[in-house]
Amino acid sequence: MESLLEFRKRKDEFLKTGTESPIPVEERTSFAGLKYFPDDPKLRFLVPLARVPEEELEFETSSGEKKIFKRIGKLGFSVEGQPVQITLYQAASGSFFLPFRDATSGKETYGAGRYLEVEEKDGKFELDFNYAYNPYCAYSSGYSCPLPPVENWLKVPIAAGEKNYLDKRDATERERGQSND
């Protein structure tokens, strides 16, 4: 896995200049990069997968359509002394999918939740929430993003990864001191 700093730099560059960037073209010239939580080594885990009977599920999306994922197991860890269980899914392509909401959702982070890419290493899964990211829907309408199912709504805060994306309107209001933050 590339370093966190390299990952963030590459992502910011893609969002500002990439032809596939979800940020509207008219906002890219003023895009100064995403806001992130500081790196937190306590939010990195290497955990075994507790397999569950595989089941295909329909996920709601931000556009109202449905997407199919397969539930493959549960991952357990602790955050601030609180036990947490999160469900891991698999897309039709075979890639793992870990969508979640947490106690920061709708406050410091995107309200609909974030995603985390995970890798399997020697039978365990590496979860590094410092790499948690917003779905494209956080940046612009017109995308159909799977919403985290209720079983992945965590009660603990995951203060790691990407924070809320602020559009130009929000940034202008902040500059004028009109924000409630």
Positions of predicted regions on the chain:
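Acidic, glycine-rich flexible loop segments
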Residues: D102-Y133
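N-terminal domain-onset segments
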Residues: M1-E55, R176-D181
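A structural detector for beta-sheet-dominated domains
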Residues: L46-P48, S78-E80, Y89, R101, ...
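Extended, aromatic/histidine-rich regions of cofactor-dependent oxidoreductases associated
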Residues: Y133-D181
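Surface-exposed peri-terminal alpha-helical interaction modules
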Residues: T17, S30-F31, F45, R51-V52, ...
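Mid-length scaffold segments of soluble, non-membrane domains
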Residues: F59-G111
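Extracellular/lumen-exposed scaffold segments
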Residues: E26-T29, E54-R71, T87, K124, ...
